[in-house]
Amino acid sequence: MAPNLRKSHPLLKLINNSLIDLPTPSNISAWWNFGSLLGICLLTQILTGLLLATHYTADTTLAFSSVAHTCRNVQYGWLIRNLHANGASFFFICIYLHIGRGFYYGSYLNKETWNTGVILLLALMATAFVGYVLPWGQMSFWGATVITNLFSAIPYIGQTLVEWAWGGFSVDNPTLTRFFALHFLLPFMIAGLAFIHLTFLHESGSNNPLGILSNCDKIPFHPYFSLKDILGFIIMFLPLTTLALFSPNLLGDPENFTPANPLVTPPHIKPEWYFLFAYAILRSIPNKLGGVLALAASVLVLFLTPLLHKSKQRAMTFRPLSQLLFWTLVANLLILTWVGSQPVEHPFIIIGQLASLAYFTILLLLFPIVGALENKMLNY
């Protein structure tokens, strides 16, 4: 019998084992769709970004007008830009839901997969930050100034580090040029990391909603889950195109319609919505270095989750106390996001501080305690 090319060809074999004949747990729910959605988000962002880069000029005098030119004079330039800007929001919605799923179902016990995932999140955050600076509007400029300035809180080398990153004594042309270079490079690095992420995942196989071993009941990825993924793509692209076509500036800051001016500070400097939770944590500490450390810890704490898993069960499916704690954490993150968008004044300061304290308490203290308590209640 002639060998099946799909299974024998070195390259096709790789694709086959990842996307066609991959043994997949039969009971994975729609929460397992977000990995492929992130892949399609990345592809969309790279494609639209490449088309935008062909019309963009990385120069402080021309950047703003080159973006305006793309929207006004380039065929469908407005659409490409709106898809790219709002695509970033959908990328973050998907990654946050993906992390939430991993957290709820104990997927973090695949340590290598989880750790590469956290690195992917950090790379995505860096990409989004440098990308936001490129249109060179007011919020782009001041966002870049404020966030890069945080590195000056690092003792001894801080100031040198910031000036090295800026390429001068303030955010200027060299900064914009290198941010464009980084924004172009990082998505390809993310693609490489995603491949590593998948390699580690396929080493152990997917987790499932019950958090139990599923080797006895697996089905091929194609056609079952390839079809389910396509449905996911449609469900994601519908709101994305709706947003890009009907309300493209809904999630943006009106301040960014004003060209960057180093002499005028915007009344409220705030990042895009997907960074607001971390921004609220940063602002809640009245000390610069302390704030920077808390900001870093707010994301880096994810590296610790596998070590803080004390339950004898993997998923939270049958752990009502942990579920309660999980949804409290979700609500807490929404409160932090809201506080981050508000000005720094009376009720918001204390709410932000309490929510920041609650965030770290739930993750570092309450989850392990409740996990151990549930073991005791179930006589494990």
Swiss-Prot record:
It comes from Uria lomvia (Thick-billed murre). GO terms for biological process: mitochondrial electron transport, ubiquinol to cytochrome c. InterPro entries: Cyt_b/b6_C (IPR005798), Cyt_b/b6_C_sf (IPR036150), Cyt_b/b6_N (IPR005797), Cytb/b6-like_sf (IPR027387), Cytochrome_b (IPR030689), Cytochrome_b_C_euk/bac (IPR048260), Cytochrome_b_N_euk/bac (IPR048259), Di-haem_cyt_TM (IPR016174). This is Cytochrome b. GO terms for cellular component: mitochondrial inner membrane; respiratory chain complex III. A ubiquinone binds at residue 202. GO terms for molecular function: metal ion binding; ubiquinol-cytochrome-c reductase activity. Its main location: mitochondrion. The chain crosses the membrane at residues 34-54, 78-99, 114-134, 179-199, 227-247, 289-309, 321-341, 348-368.
